[in-house]
């Protein structure tokens, strides 16, 4: 599993992305080139020593990075509420060998859904219509590992 962060800017969210991803054995995280990273103390503090335990690659152009990942055979799955979103529990992750989970920015979500193979949504039962991007990532990674298993390997 790889994670592509689309313009996530909050240092705490970047740090928690690494912390949660490492907990589930994620192989690689892609960050936009101007994202805060190991020079930012809030990122370092929230990541809790996981920043260099996961491969990280910085990209410049979001659409170009999506196209490259698709050319490499990855299925791009956006974690986003759209009219076409599939309930996360109904999405079969086992049908996809190479997966990139796409996280949208805190304010605007995923800016371009044209290259996405699917969008998944997490059912919510309260009055709030959204949740923090990293909470969504944690729930999604739990569902992925629940479906595909891990057998103590990177996913």
What is each residue range found by the language model?
Residues 113-155:
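Structured adenosyl-cofactor binding patch, chiefly the S-adenosyl-L-methionine
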Residues 14-15, 40-41, 87-89, 111-114, ...:
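Short glycine-/acidic-enriched loop or helix-start segments at secondary-structure transitions
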Residues 56, 76-86, 124-131, 153-154:
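Short secondary-structure transition/capping segments
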Residues 16, 61, 79, 105, ...:
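Gly/Ser/Thr-rich helix-start
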Residues 1-82, 145:
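RNA substrate-binding interface of SAM-dependent RNA methyltransferases
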Residues 81-124:
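Active-site/ligand-binding-proximal alpha/beta "capping" segment
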Residues 17-19, 43-46, 90-94, 115-117, ...:
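Short, glycine/charged-enriched secondary-structure capping and boundary segments
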């Amino acid at each position: 599993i790889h994670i592509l962060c689309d313009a996530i800017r909050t240092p705490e969210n970047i740090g928690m992305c690494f912390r949660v991803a490492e907990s589930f054995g994620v192989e690689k995280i892609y960050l936009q080139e101007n994202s805060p990273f190991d020079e930012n103390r809030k990122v370092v503090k929230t990541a809790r020593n996981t920043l260099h335990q996961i491969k990280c690659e910085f990209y410049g152009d979001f659409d170009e990075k999506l196209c490259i990942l698709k050319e490499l055979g990855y299925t791009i799955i956006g974690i986003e509420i759209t009219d076409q979103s599939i309930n996360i529990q109904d999405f079969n992750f086992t049908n996809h060998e190479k997966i990139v989970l796409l996280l949208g920015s805190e304010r605007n979500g995923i800016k371009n859904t044209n290259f996405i193979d699917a969008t998944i949504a997490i059912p919510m039962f309260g009055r709030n219509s959204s949740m923090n991007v990293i909470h969504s990532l944690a729930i999604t990674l739990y569902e992925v590992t629940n479906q595909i298993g891990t057998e103590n390997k990177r996913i």
